[in-house]
Amino acid sequence: MTQFIDTLVGIFQSSGFARFGEPGGYLYAIMICVGCFLLYLAIVKEFEPLILLPMAFGMILANLPGSGVIHMQYFVGDGLEHPMWVEILNNGGLADMLYMGVKLGIYPPLIFLGIGTMTVFAPLISNPKSLLLGAAAQFGIFGTYMGARLLTATGLVDFTQKQSAAIAIIGGADGPTAIFVTSRLAPELLGSIAVAAYSYMALVPVIQPPIMKALTSKKERSVVMKQLRTVSKTERIIFPIMVTIIVSLIVPDAAVLVGMLMLGNLMKECGVVDRIQKTAGNELMNIITIFLALSVGCTTSANTFLNTRTLFIIVLGLIAFSFGTAAGVLFGKLMYVLSGGQVNPLIGSAGVSAVPMAARVSQKVGQSENPSNFLLMHAMGPNVAGVIGSAVAAGILINIFG
């Protein structure tokens, strides 16, 4: 009987329940609750469910005491040196193998490949000036970098230059880009930045309208824009090729993101590779999304997530997103003045690369002022320009701080 009781005690002591009673064990419980809350947002509120659901579940898995789902000590350093490979291959598990795709920068470009197969650049081609709105919205990224450096200077928090740059990229409202930059510059902040980036992407309809209305007048919001011209198939085919060449020559570090985005779009527009275009936009993208979100979720351990830095990252992420929206709207107002009132400033807010949510918000706010107004296609120009802009901004940050 004594042996039986000792066996039961031994089983309990080796279980995860016993570890909740250890010093700091309550942190695991907090992280599990955070994961469950994100699952609630994904399932009930439908906030970016394709990403948040596997990410939140990965967060729960990684914070179950004793589970040993991922071993982040194998990934210390800037690259994967020979001893790390040996440790990962011999002692690593599923999450370790999947995380190698994040560490090596494989998943985000493949996500961009899938995005490219679903992106329509015709509104941008027919109105090239909308590229400026997409570029203007990226000012939020660089403004937030300065904000992070200012916070560090005041002593409130200690962010390095690389960490500040990784946080700033949240302002691009592009999850894969944020993960790509963070994995290169500040992998220790990957979980916090990924959660913030995708949360704010889901909150586009909540965050943007108050900023848009505060910076524009009723007259400006009521502007009806002329119908866009029809774009030929030749233009749609040449565009991704030329963008890849020009952007890669100007910002070589953006070549992999922009190149994969444009390859996906070329597959879509050329019309001769339907089979691989559908695979890249459906099966491949779905598989990579699962791998990416699950592995990123597994990096959110209690000791790296539950600290004041995460709180500042969330605040700075909101500032970055708000700055990007405001910069786009203000540049839209400038174009409104220069065009003699022919450009609706609301389309400037779509310069952040949350496709197509930001464009839909421009449409909704515009129709609330003028029910006969249809801004969606006009807003899609800055929206897809924002995707290119965020990739270019990522390349610039990696070039400077990488």
Residue ranges and their predicted role:
Residues M1-P23, A29, F75-E87, N91, ...:
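Intrinsically disordered, low-complexity non-transmembrane regions of multi-pass membrane transporters
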Residues L39-L53, F57, G66-V69, T154, ...:
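Flexible hinge motifs at transmembrane-helix junctions and intramembrane kinks/re-entrant loops
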Residues L61, Y99-I125, G264-M267, M285-N307:
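Hydrophobic transmembrane alpha-helices of secondary-active transporters
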Residues M100-L104, F112-M118, L133-G143, G147, ...:
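Alpha-helical membrane segments and immediately flanking helix-loop junctions
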Residues P123-Y145, S301-G328, A379-N383:
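Entry/N-cap segments of selected transmembrane alpha helices
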Residues E188-V206, L316-G324, I347:
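Alpha-helical transmembrane segments
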Residues A196-V272:
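Membrane-embedded hairpin module used as a gating/binding unit in multi-pass transport
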Residues T244-G328:
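Transmembrane helical segments that form the transport core of multi-pass membrane transport proteins
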